Amino acid sequence: MRKILVTNALPYANGDLHLGHMLGYIQSDIWVRFQKLQGNQCIFVCGSDTHGTPIMLKAKSLGITPEELVTKYSNRHLQDFTDFEINFDNYHSTHNSLNKEIVEDIYNKLNNKNLISKKAIAQAYDPEAKMFLPDRFVKGTCPKCKAEDQYGDSCEVCGATYDPTELINPRSVISGQSPIQKNSEHFFFDLPALEKNIKDWIESNTLLQPEVANKLAEWFEQGLQSWDISRDAPYFGFAIPGTNEQKFFYVWLDAPMGYIASFKDYCNKNNINFGDFWGDSSSESELYHFIGKDIIYFHTLFWPAILSSTGYKTPTSVFANGFLTVNGKKMSKSRGTFIQARTYLDNLEPSYLRYYFASRLTSRIDDIDLNLEEFVTKSNSDIVGKVVNIASRCAGFIYKKFDATLSGEIFDPELESEFSKNHDAITQAFEKREFAHAVRLIMALADKANQFIDYHKPWQLAKEEGQEQKVHQVCSQGINMFKVLIVYLKPIIPSIVAEAERFLNIQFISWADAPKFLINHKIDKFKPLATRIEKEKVDKILEDTKKMLENEQSPQSKKEEPKLDIAAECTFDDFMKVDLRIAKITEASHVEGADKLLKLILDLGGVTKQVFAGIKSAYKPEDLIGKHTIMVANLAPRKMKFGMSEGMVLAAGDGKGIYILEPHEGAQPGMRVK
């Protein structure tokens, strides 16, 4: 029995999953199910990737905390996976104490080996947003191939990697402004020092895809560079120890460690020895990472380097899949082809898409096209017309005429032998992730089964006197061929196969026993296992996707010229009654039991006031201490549930964010604002 640990790329918890995501998860799930059917101990883990600037900014725009945002999308992702029959043994998150402990431990080990250094670098800084910009928040023209609208770290056209400062005509994704260059001290991982480790891993990896090997050779030729593993505050993630929460681990450092955390969490729950699967290099277990082709760089350079230098087993291999196109073109919201997983599930069963993807997937990193017309035809022809049809043509005769019991003899041993002889070829195809080849072999057998039934015509034999035994044997062989096919298809369409197993009255058949026919075996009454896809269902998926786009755009498309909702006019004397003062925030803290409030202690130049301000969604207490702001100093004190509020801090807001007012330098606590 093999010990196999499989991980899948962690989905980023700031949006819903689409069918392009599902391609990779379905691929790995099929392979894992196949391994388990063979009797191997195969553990499948995943989790949510939850850190980074995109999550921080989206949460802020929604007026919620990053934790609330990632919880929302993690739950939605897991439900989509469950409904698509992606059967993870454990689903975790990168935002928890276990992952933090692992990240800091690995960082300390790297640091102790002098593989971490610090140096000041020029970074893109958005003066309007007042923050350093992550690589993906800078866009511009690729410095290598001159493709426009490329991210600040890599080009999606030519695959080049570079520094954001190298972009031509860069702009901030946040404000649209041209970023300025500003120095900041960052932490770097010495990747070049571990080049030999990486090359040794590549040489020992007999399963590495040729496309990956070629890309690695290209990167080595360009020369490895030290890797910036830090990001400046503000940032949602784990602070680097000893930086007073001013520097944070780059999301791509802590995200892969989420694999370790998810598996360790599984081990803790199930009393499994972590080292048996993910110990050091001497471990005989197998470790596989399934990923999309856009993240090969991180998983085949940085990840093996980090693992090999910190005492962890390196991957047995990394398997990458291509992107998904729909009807021959890039997924598009305007065409209704940017289909979310949930939109598909609201209209169709997952088995059809799982089967279609399997029929197109190979071990190569090829893009897969979801041709919707072919999708309907193939699902109806193969699943319904070929496989399920075998059982529906034979089951009634067995159930009604022969006490639901299969024959004790095999009618056509030669045909049975042909089904048996294909077992090894189908097994090898699944093992090598050549699912398209496996499907072709399985469907070729389904064709032979249907030809056998067509030739003997049990529906006609049943009308002829003295042909009862032949009807029994022909239909029994048909049911047995169906049984072989559904075992082979179990990794691909598990829910349909589960229904078929109930009909066949079998609880579990191992992969090795798949070709064996059932003799004198009692079956149950046949019920339809799958129905044909109507074209209208697919059309509705496209319509629902377009409507989703319209709903997203409607607030913008109907946007009128901004109108200021000016309050009722007041006199100068009325205004002068309001005493506005410069105040320094000397203390700031959370208010227990309050969702929106922070407690502020304000210094007005010798006079101290306590204020409860509804700014919790926008600011951390520690970020406010020492700031100057403006307050209404003569507002009548107001007794609140949490204490006395002795004024009001001024802030601006548009429903998307809250921004406290800060005076220019030189303004001192106690000065009056006029």
From Swiss-Prot:
Family listed: Belongs to the class-I aminoacyl-tRNA synthetase family. MetG type 1 subfamily.
Residue ranges occupied by any tRNA-binding domain in the UniProt entry: 574-674
InterPro entries with a match to the protein in the record: aa-tRNA-synth_I_CS, Anticodon_Met, Met-tRNA-synth_bsu_C, Met-tRNA_ligase_1, Met-tRNA_synth, Methionyl/Leucyl_tRNA_Synth, MetRS_core, MetRS_Zn
Ligand binding (Zn(2+)): 142, 145, 155, 158
Classification via SUPFAM superfamilies: Anticodon-binding domain of a subclass of class I aminoacyl-tRNA synthetases, Methionyl-tRNA synthetase (MetRS), Zn-domain, Nucleic acid-binding proteins, Nucleotidylyl transferase
Pfam hit, one: tRNA-synt_1g
Catalytic activity: tRNA(Met) + L-methionine + ATP = L-methionyl-tRNA(Met) + AMP + diphosphate
Motif segment ('KMSKS' region): 330-334
Any one GO molecular-function label of the UniProt entry: tRNA binding
Required co-factors: Zn(2+)
Keyword annotations of the record: Aminoacyl-tRNA synthetase, ATP-binding, Cytoplasm, Ligase, Metal-binding, Nucleotide-binding, Protein biosynthesis, RNA-binding, tRNA-binding, Zinc
Cofactor detail note: Binds 1 zinc ion per subunit.
Quaternary structure and interacting proteins, as annotated: Homodimer.
Function: Is required not only for elongation of protein synthesis but also for the initiation of all mRNA translation through initiator tRNA(fMet) aminoacylation.
Protein name: Methionine--tRNA ligase
Span(s) of short sequence motif 'HIGH' region: 11-21
Chain positions recorded as ATP binding sites: 333
Organism (species): Francisella tularensis subsp. tularensis (strain SCHU S4 / Schu 4)
CDD domains named in the record: Anticodon_Ia_Met, MetRS_core, tRNA_bind_EcMetRS_like
Superkingdom as given in the UniProt entry: Bacteria
A biological process term (GO) from this entry: methionyl-tRNA aminoacylation
This enzyme's EC code(s): 6.1.1.10
Any GO CC annotation of this UniProt entry: cytosol
Localisation: Cytoplasm
